[in-house]
Amino acid sequence: MAVERSKRINLYDEEKLKQVNPENMKLLEKYHIDMSIRDLSPNTVYGYNVDLKQWFIFLYDKQFNLSVLEATEDDIEEYYFWRKQQGNNVNRQKRVMASISAFYKFLRKKKLITESPVEFIDRPKEGQAVVTQTYLTKEEVQLMREKLEEYGDVQLQAYAFLSLTSMGRVNAIANLKWSQINWDERFFGDVLEKEGKIVELSFSLETKEYLQKLIKYREEKGIDDYGWVFLSPYVTPDKPINNGTLNDWCKKIGAMIGQPTLHCHDFRHSYANLMKSEGVNLEDISTMLNHSGTDVTKKHYLKQDTKKIREIKDSISI
């Protein structure tokens, strides 16, 4: 059964943003410089930017256009409580809290504040997943292969099988450039992953063929992709494809194979689980996923084999 998505809260208003406390906007500009120096991905910066601007508009609307330097723990808790009342689920709430916390960490680093007002605000405990986790079977992967071939969009083929066989996170996939490919060894190098890790994303022989077909197609059509692997009408030399666009592609692929809740992260879950079913050990799967340890892999990425557990229990007579 699908889990209902968190209600989308959109405070963004161009006119109100012009009225936001100028000090807040200047601090945000400084934060942008800091994020640029740290070489955060464009999508990460975009996420922080959206979260912080929505908060600034709340400060303008509900809290007398308060400066973030003067906001107290109570002021910020009021914002979190308001979001919860509007329908945010735990996962979305945690992301907003993380964005504001990171901003205050920057302000403290720059000695603009002595204490962070969010330091002692507890994060909500683990809640329901934003969307259902889908574990694709070998049969569904084969069906996906057939349906995509029939559909005839080579970019969609390349995306699906690169995401699946590389097990890369959506943000890493979105930011891939052709210059990062080692064709002989079949991997993308110097890939920026979660928490600033630099990793390799290896891919299958089948994926290599799709990527080569994609290059040939663009050359024949005279399409300038600005060096990015994946392309949409909104991609520019400095702006990669948006994560939301990749998620839309996932929905399209999911609809083809009878999995309407399919989303980007499901490719990671699915390939990890398929590897497990083929006898690959947990440590190797964890390394493929670029996890720091096996705990996360086991808890969040591998589907529990309840049938095997029942068989073990039935084999013991007490």
Model-derived features: where do they sit?
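N-terminal core-binding DNA-recognition domain of tyrosine recombinases/integrases
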Residues: 29-131, 258
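Basic, Lys/Arg- and aromatic-enriched nucleic-acid-binding interface segment
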Residues: 129, 138-170
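Conserved tyrosine-mediated DNA breakage-rejoining catalytic core shared by Y-recombinases
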Residues: 175-210
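DNA breakage-rejoining catalytic core of tyrosine-based enzymes
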Residues: 113-115, 127-143, 195-206, 222-226
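C-terminal catalytic core of tyrosine-transesterase DNA break-rejoin enzymes
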Residues: 161, 165, 268-291
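Short, polar N-cap/turn motifs at the start of nucleic acid-interacting alpha helices
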Residues: 181-183, 260-261, 280-299
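Active-site/catalytic core of tyrosine-dependent DNA strand-transfer enzymes
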Residues: 204-259
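DNA/chromatin major-groove-contacting recognition/catalytic segments
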Residues: 4-5, 299, 303-318
